Amino acid sequence: MIIQLHENQRGQVRLNSHHSESFPITNGVKQGCVLAPTLFSIFFSVMLKQAMEGLDEDEAVYIRYRLDGSLFNLRRLQAHTKTCEQIFRDLLFADDAALVAHTERALQCLTSCFAEAAQLFGLEVSLKKTEVLHQPAPREEYRLPHITIGETVLKSVHQFTYLGCTITSDAKIDREVDNRLAKANSAFGRLYKRVWRNKHLKRGTKISVYRAVVLTTLLYGSESWVTYRHHMRLLERFHQRCLRIILNIHWTDYVTNVEVLEQAEIPSIEAMLLKTQLRWAGHISRMEDHRLPKIALYGELSTGNRDRGAPKKRFKDILKKSLGTCHIDHCQWSTLAADRASWRHIVHQAASSFEESRKDHLREKRRRRKNREASAATPNVTFDCGRCGRACLSRIGLVSHMRACSRRGLPL
């Protein structure tokens, strides 16, 4: 029946009001057909299987993992009899494919086999869209990779966008955060006159639009972010600027950031990230054991070591800190996450409690700063001029006044 749906297909090209002569369509799937995604996935899987046949086992990336025991007990991965290894060479989504390998030679072999299999099945690799990214090990010098398809040398880049997220050669999210801020700022600016300055819309409606359009753009893919304090400052600064524009709060009004969040009835970016990352971790823990995200979370690369001294933070480190902040036991969190509804309720309560604690901390910090400023101020102390006897409130004022007195020739 599927074959009959695709037999004797013909098409035409329409340009303005003119149509070309009809021509037969002998390959491909129907555009807009509900079967097209499934059929292409099956076709692509068979092609990929053909491409990977005969490859050496060392031309791949291995992950050593162990699903029992505590996630944060890394010593459990040192057991040789209780750990498993998972091999993967490709990361697929629809018609996008990412090939991964540890060495340049292995990646060249993978790329050549993939291109040959694609040509065998009537597909063509887009050379303009295909790029090579090299992520060197810590303290290893960056070397420009040389990967070819046929006689064409593929472009080597330090960053590229895959599924909407920016991946860089230094394995940091600095550029991703910058891109998210730029896209969110663009989305916010396009609605400036239409929504934010529209006097006919209620404040609640504007906040709902801000949540649906701007925040979703800003926090796209943030479930797996490994953030540092400077990233959080950039995100919170943008969040506050947008809310102050929506609420029409000027800097001369002297409204604190906590009061802005309370007026908008919206949490901080830090609380949002805490909530989304805990929910994402619970979703991974409920996955089947053969799923790659779960294997990556509960395992580590079989090849290579982390840098000594101050290594880069991992998602596990962020997760452990978030669990501690929410007062959730590190050893029992996966058991709690097994029940989806219960875990969502726990995370929601924990995020709300964290936000209240954060606000109280900021209020107390501001109160202490005001007290220090009040105690440091000495309005009753004066500095008297030895020439004319005038009292100045500050030492620098006295110096300036004495200079003027000396020009007038007053005696000491």
Show the residue positions of the predicted features.
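Short linear motifs embedded in intrinsically disordered, charge-biased segments
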Residues: 4-412
